[in-house]
Amino acid sequence: MLIITRKKGESLMIGDDIEITISKIDDGSVKIGINAPKNISILRKELYEEVMEENKQAIKIDMNLLKNIKKR
C-alpha cells in the first residue's frame, strides 16, 4: 500500500486520467473529489462489497428448478 500525505486543495494522479483531490478535512473525516473517465466505476468499499455479495447470491442456481425444467 502506498501512503501519501496531502493537504486541502492538493491532488494526486492515478495513471494519466484519474485525479483525486482533497477538498475538505474535518475531525476524523476527509472529503475527496475524484475526476475519472465515465467508464471507471467508483464506489465506496462498503457498497462495493455489498454489490459483490448480491452478485454472488444472484448466480446461485436452484437445482430443483433446473430438474423441473429438464423434466418438461
Swiss-Prot record:
It is found in: Cytoplasm. Keywords: Bacterial flagellum biogenesis, Cytoplasm, Repressor, RNA-binding, Translation regulation. InterPro entries: CsrA, CsrA_sf. It comes from the Bacteria. The keyword Protein transport does not apply. SUPFAM superfamilies: CsrA-like. Gene3D superfamilies: Translational regulator CsrA (2.60.40.4380). It holds the Pfam family CsrA. GO terms for cellular component: cytosol. A translational regulator that binds mRNA to regulate translation initiation and/or mRNA stability. Usually binds in the 5'-UTR at or near the Shine-Dalgarno sequence preventing ribosome-binding, thus repressing translation. Its main target seems to be the major flagellin gene, while its function is anatagonized by FliW. PANTHER family: CARBON STORAGE REGULATOR (PTHR34984:SF1). HAMAP family: CsrA (MF_00167). Homodimer; the beta-strands of each monomer intercalate to form a hydrophobic core, while the alpha-helices form wings that extend away from the core. Belongs to the CsrA/RsmA family. This is Translational regulator CsrA. It comes from Clostridium beijerinckii (strain ATCC 51743 / NCIMB 8052). The gene is csrA.
